[in-house]
């Protein structure tokens, strides 16, 4: 997202419950529905969250989707198999009972994964996250390596014709051609989502494209976390506030 699309880092108001009336709701996962964890494979999803999202989806006549940087396979393993899903930043799609739609894993991703492992071997605290069609390098546990990790990702992206996706304390290499904004556009064309007003909830810079797409389609973005330059119109301070807002919305819509 270009800087010109981002408003300054000011305190944004909380979203009104009326925003959910008639909404097509797009929810990021990590840092939005569940707190960020030191290791991405250490995250867990509780039944209370799944039940809340299912209830909210029913209140919205099916207009709810999870839009995540995680792969569809991982989202399904975490318990979201009954929901409309967009994974790997909009490169994959799936809904309950249907096969995953998305590109095959490129040989270049395997080459990048090997390079990431070689880089991490003598740099403690780094973690490689293998995804179905991409690979991430996390430096939350070794922040001193962040600049080197970013430089390596840029070099490998140029070498293999891939896209660098930056997130919180991580870099990821993946094929181009999609982001969370394009995911919103694709999902809004589905019969079960059409007619809704898009509302995108997310915490990371990777969610900015989702905020922009929602706004362009007449909706709004909700930033989760501290104020920063953003295309979102509203803000919720933390994951607990997101869950409270969604629970209130489900009750009101019921």
Feature locations, PLM:
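Non-catalytic pre-domain segments flanking phosphatase-related domains
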Residues: 1-29, 33-37, 48, 188-189, ...
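Mg2+-dependent phosphoryl-transfer enzymes with acidic/Ser/Thr/Gly-rich catalytic loops
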Residues: 2-9, 183-254
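The start of beta-strands in P-loop NTPase/AAA+ ATPase cores
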Residues: 23-25, 63, 83, 198
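Active-site phosphate-binding/coordination module
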Residues: 44-130
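Short, structured coil segments at secondary-structure junctions
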Residues: 79-82, 160, 216-217, 230-231
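Substrate-recognition "cap/lid" segment bordering the active-site pocket of phosphatases
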Residues: 88, 94-114, 165-195
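Short amphipathic alpha-helices in soluble, non-transmembrane regions
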Residues: 112-116, 148-157
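Charged, glycine-interspersed solvent-exposed loop segments at helix/strand-loop junctions
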Residues: 127-143, 162-174
């Amino acid at each position: 997202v270009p800087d010109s699309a981002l408003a300054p880092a000011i305190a944004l108001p909380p979203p009104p419950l009326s925003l959910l009336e008639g909404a097509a709701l797009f929810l990021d996962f990590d840092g939005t529905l569940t707190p960020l964890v030191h290791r991405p494979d250490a995250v867990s999803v509780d039944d209370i969250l799944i039940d809340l999202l299912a209830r909210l989806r029913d209140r919205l006549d099916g207009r709810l989707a999870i839009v995540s940087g995680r792969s569809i396979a991982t989202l399904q393993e975490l318990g979201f198999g009954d929901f409309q899903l967009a994974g790997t930043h909009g490169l994959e799609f799936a809904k309950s009972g249907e096969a995953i739609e998305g590109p095959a894993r490129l040989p270049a991703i395997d080459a990048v994964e090997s390079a990431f492992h070689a880089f991490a071997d003598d740099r403690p605290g780094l973690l490689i996250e293998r995804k179905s069609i991409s690979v991430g390098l996390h430096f939350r546990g070794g922040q001193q390596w962040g600049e080197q990790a970013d430089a390596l990702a840029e070099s490998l992206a140029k070498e293999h014709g891939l896209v660098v996706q930056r997130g919180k304390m991580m870099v990821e290499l993946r094929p181009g051609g999609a982001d969370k904004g394009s995911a919103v556009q694709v999902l809004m064309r589905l019969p079960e989502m059409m007619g809704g007003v898009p509302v995108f909830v997310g915490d990371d810079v990777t969610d900015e494209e989702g905020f922009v797409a929602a706004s362009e389609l007449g909706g709004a973005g909700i930033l989760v976390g501290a104020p920063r330059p953003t295309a979102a119109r509203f803000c919720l301070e933390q994951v607990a506030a997101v869950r409270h807002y969604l629970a209130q919305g489900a009750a009101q819509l019921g």
